[in-house]
Amino acid sequence: GTPILHREKFSSADGLGHFFGIEYRPPAEVADEEYPFTLMTGRLLFHYHTRTQTGRAKILHHEVPEAYVQINTEDAARLNIKNGEKIRLRSRRGEAEAIARVTDEVGPGVLMMTMHFSGKGSVNQLTNTALDPMSKMPELKHSAVAVEKITEVQ
């Protein structure tokens, strides 16, 4: 073995790398009237997986102490959601709660929720279990959800 694979050539008969395109397949679940947002899961710089290690580091916990959801500025305004408010996401599989981060880093109709938290902040309560037929990877980047602001009365 070598520290870097394929530095001089690939391990194919002709020494070249071969790429193959695949036919586009739409996601198993798309946004609709009841669940109008597309949810993506995402990682953070400050935490690793479910925080079994990074969650105990005070400085890392201080940076991101709880789950958050990035929501587009236009969507937040339409739903009267302010930055830092608690929101609830609902899918066909469950619900989760997190802090809203209003931003233009995600497009309209798209939400990004951190994947590192458990309990009410667990994005896995929402994600679609459909598997890609080729890779067998779950569609964690494409789940239809609804969003609502959590009020004191609820």
Show the residue positions of the predicted features:
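Long, low-complexity segments enriched in small/aliphatic residues
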Residues: 1-59
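Long, contiguous, secondary-structure-rich segments that constitute the structural scaffold
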Residues: 34, 50, 54-70, 74-154
